[in-house]
Every structure is written in C-alpha cells, then in structure tokens.
Amino acid sequence: GDSWIGPVYHGILSTPFVDVPTGTLYTVTMGRKDKESNLSVHALDIYTGKPKYNSPQLLSFPFAGAETLTNVKGALQRVGLLMRNDVLYIAFGNIVPDPKDQHWSQEGFVQSFNARDLSQRLAVFQSTPTGRKGGIWQAGRGIASDRDGNIYIATAGGRYDGVTNFGSSVLKFAPSSLKLIDWFTPHNHEFLFLQNID
C-alpha cells in the first residue's frame, strides 16, 4: 500500500507564516471528512483565532490531463509558507493517482494567493506535469525570496528536460505570477535521481 507516506489524515505539517503588522497567521491544514482528504489554507487572527480574509479555502491541484483534484490523501504540504508583498506562497509534494489514467503521479506544485483574500488564487506551477517525481519537500524548510520579490524553491529528485519537467532543480520565479525565469540543475541530475542521492 501507500502507508509509507502516512497515514496523514489531519493536522498541520509545515511552518506557518505570521504577518505581524496585520496580526495574521497563515497555515495549511490536512483534514479528513467522508473518506476524503483535503488540504485547506487558513488566515487566522493571532489574538482571537478567528478566520480572516475569506478563509479557509479548499486547495485544488490541476493535473496535465485537465482534471483538478481536491481529494488528495497523498499530497503533503511540508515546506514553510512565505508571504511577500501581500502574496502568499505555498509549495507541495504529492503522490496521488492521476485522474487521467490512475497511474501514481508524483510531482510538486507551487501556488500563489492574494494574502488579503484567499479566495483569489493567482497562479499555479507544476514541477513535473508528466508525474515523474520532482516534489517540493525541502526537508520542511521555507520558500525563499530576494529583495526584488522573486521566489526560490528546490525540487526533489525527478525528471528534468528543461521544458516542462524540472525535477532535481533550484527554480526562480517572478513574483505573484510564478513565471519561471531561471533555474539551476546539476549536470549529473539523471544519475543523482536514479541513485536517489540528490
């Protein structure tokens, strides 16, 4: 079975982000209801615990086969959250059956949201649309940014072709839009991936 990835049915797996000026804590939770496992993003008042900014919002994951899933038992959100210039960034790794053909699909996602209205998802980036690994785990470390607001993440071992698949790479994105603007991939990425020593 797939018990090695869990079982993870509920809780918070990543480091939340606290926006001190607005007194807001942003976090992602995994919940289980009616045999479905769902991830949700929350904005909470740090003084009262009450929801803010149209939260919680159910997270969804678009696949290359044009279907979108919200029941994602194998999706894990381990990477620390980041908020920059009123945009919230969340990264994921998943091991989920692709709805197109039910093969076990493994890839990473980065999603950006309007931090003042979590019902507004701004962009989604999928690291390996072919489902050939490349999840975003980062050993729980957070998403990084530079002084210009560009966003940086590292993908795990996976397929790389420099076109649509970006496993085993460090990726640089434009703010908000998640447009991929640069990346680094080691020359021996295939060896590192196949030997699981990335």
Regions inferred by a protein language model and the residue ranges of each:
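Mobile, glycine-rich extracellular loop/lid and propeptide segments
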Residues: 1-198
